[in-house]
Amino acid sequence: MSVDLATVKRVAKLARIAVSEDEANRMVGELNGILGFVEQLSEVNVDGVEAMTSVTPMAMKKRADEVTDGNKAADIVANAPVTDHNFFLVPKVVE
């Protein structure tokens, strides 16, 4: 897979990021380099290799899940300009 200039410009537009022509050209090379590295990783034979989350074995401390509302709704919306029944009200952005 490779990225072309049109793809970089399209992604920048979708992300609403201003990208100059020079930056877009530079990003094409950088993104293609990253994708090339990812393709190299996908070619590595990992048959028989056990999945791991860390280089060194670590045990995570666990706690029992408890469902609560946190009792902080009023604190959370206290600085919001407009709220209704502890919900944030925001302007409509999609027509």
Curated annotation (Swiss-Prot):
Task: Give the function comment from the record.
Answer: Allows the formation of correctly charged Asn-tRNA(Asn) or Gln-tRNA(Gln) through the transamidation of misacylated Asp-tRNA(Asn) or Glu-tRNA(Gln) in organisms which lack either or both of asparaginyl-tRNA or glutaminyl-tRNA synthetases. The reaction takes place in the presence of glutamine and ATP through an activated phospho-Asp-tRNA(Asn) or phospho-Glu-tRNA(Gln).
Q: Which GO terms describe its molecular function?
A: asparaginyl-tRNA synthase (glutamine-hydrolyzing) activity; ATP binding; glutaminyl-tRNA synthase (glutamine-hydrolyzing) activity
Kindly state which keywords UniProt assigns to this record, in alphabetical order: ATP-binding, Ligase, Nucleotide-binding, Protein biosynthesis
Assembly and binders: Heterotrimer of A, B and C subunits.
Show the taxonomic lineage: Bacteria, Pseudomonadati, Pseudomonadota, Alphaproteobacteria, Hyphomicrobiales
Q: What class of enzyme is it?
A: ligase
The domain of life is: Bacteria
Which cysteines are cross-linked by disulfides? none
Give the record's GO biological process terms. glutaminyl-tRNAGln biosynthesis via transamidation; regulation of translational fidelity; translation
Q: What is this protein called?
A: Aspartyl/glutamyl-tRNA(Asn/Gln) amidotransferase subunit C
Q: What is its EC number?
A: 6.3.5.-
